[in-house]
From Swiss-Prot:
Residues 60-64 are annotated as: G2. One of its GO terms (cellular component) is cytosol. It comes from Colwellia psychrerythraea (strain 34H / ATCC BAA-681) (Vibrio psychroerythus). HAMAP family: EF_Tu_B (MF_00118_B). This is Elongation factor Tu. Residues 10-204 form the tr-type G domain. PROSITE patterns: G_TR_1 (PS00301), G_TR_2 (PS51722).
């Protein structure tokens, strides 16, 4: 039989498994792959392939992640699974694999454990919008009341972190049972797939958002004006539209008088494209790398924010020594480094390489930012940490 062509006709959604070590995240990932490929076709990935996750580098940090893909009735999914707890933290903070929703795996035999809580908290901090629960290992618990109790505990824990614990789907199943071909447990995997389709809304595509393009370079073209270049992060820019230049200095307004790509003139620049935008009335020295070009009023400059941060260990090429309050590294946002001072939380005296924690940063210059924006922490061009803006303060 000839290979089927990959059809881009279904909406695409990114998901991943989270939860405590040994609760069955990778087994569930393998079970989803096995059951859904049986129903909808595609390539099956087995446990060993998923568990043997390749190394990837994201913002100078090495992370092990496994990617699988599968289809449901309504959608195409890309699913990430990480082998180690540290990989999860790094993955979520760097946004290496951004999730539109997560499947929280909780073993019915254990109930919620420390990493269960930690992954829920991280999901809240880094902006994972939806969580679905898969209660695993239900085949070895024969006490109905115990299952109910565990489900109640998980729901309460999710509510504690502002997820709708009472309303979100909880599926009781057995990943191993499904992998072994037991029809009753396979049906629970199909139920999980239906929950993904119905509970996680279709994500807004980058092209539908308000226009924003981080500025990488600025040129002046005699007789035509100033051109800024960069990759459009989201939205569309059309000739004649008003734009703002935000960050580092006071916000300036301008109008787009031309868009070009590979030296060709275009009517518009779209999300994902590298292009040059010609700006009316601005001189070359008015604009610099590190600012962003955006739709008026869509993003504001800020200097103070709370962040969730992972500090690289010595083995990862990070610092060899801890840092203390008053630490002033550079924070690399999109295209530029800005110096900032770190304010450690109450009771934290020092931060060791390999730690992850929450701290407040005050930058010396404002940066265009929204909650959920990722950054790297650098010292003289070397990455020593990664973070995400969890709350804007000023």
């Amino acid at each position: 039989m000839a290979k089927e062509k990959f059809e881009r006709n279904k909406p695409h959604v990114n998901v991943g498994t989270i939860g405590h070590v040994d609760h069955g995240k990778t087994t569930l990932t393998a079970a989803i792959s096995a059951v859904l490929t049986k129903v909808h076709g595609g390539e099956v990935k087995d446990f060993a392939q998923i568990d043997n996750a390749p190394e990837e580098r994201e913002r100078g940090i090495t992370i092990n992640t496994s990617h699988i893909e599968y289809d449901t009735e309504a959608r195409h999914y890309a699913h990430v699974d990480c082998p180690g707890h540290a990989d999860y933290i790094k993955n979520m903070i760097t946004g290496a694999a951004q999730m539109d929703g997560a499947i929280l795996v909780v073993a019915a035999t254990d109930g919620p454990m420390p990493q269960t809580r930690e992954h829920i908290l991280l999901s809240r901090q880094v902006g994972v919008p939806f969580i679905i629960v898969f209660m695993n290992k239900c085949d070895v618990v024969d006490d109905e009341e115990l299952l109910e109790l565990v489900e109640m505990e998980v729901r309460e824990l999710l509510s504690e972190y502002d997820f709708p614990g009472d309303d979100l789907p909880v599926i009781q199943g057995s990943a191993l049972g499904a992998l072994q071909g037991d029809e009753a447990w396979e049906a629970k995997i199909i139920e999980l797939a239906d929950a993904l389709d119905t509970y996680i809304p279709e994500p807004e595509r980058a092209i539908d958002g308000a226009f924003i393009m981080p500025i990488e370079d600025v040129f002046s073209i005699s007789g035509r004006g100033t051109v800024v270049t960069g990759r459009v992060e989201r939205g569309i820019i059309k000739i004649g539209e008003e734009v703002e230049v935000v960050g580092i200095r006071d916000t300036q307004k301008s109008t787009c008088t031309g868009v070009e790509m590979f030296r060709k003139l275009l009517d518009e620049g779209r999300a994902g494209e590298n292009c040059g935008v010609l700006l009316r009335g601005l001189k070359r020295e008015d604009v610099e790398r590190g600012q962003v070009l955006c739709a008026p009023g869509s993003i504001l400059p800020h200097t103070k924010f709370e962040s969730e941060v992972y500090v690289l260990s010595k083995d990862e090429g990070g610092r060899h020594t801890p840092f203390f309050k008053g630490y002033r590294p550079q924070f690399y946002f999109r295209t530029t480094d800005i110096t900032g001072a770190v304010e450690l939380p109450e009771g934290v005296e020092m931060v060791m390489p390999g730690d992850n924690l929450k701290f407040v940063v005050e930058l010396i210059n404002p940066v265009a930012m929204d909650e959920g924006l990722r950054f790297a922490i650098r010292e003289g061009g070397r990455t020593v940490g990664a973070g995400v803006v969890s709350k804007i303060m000023a």
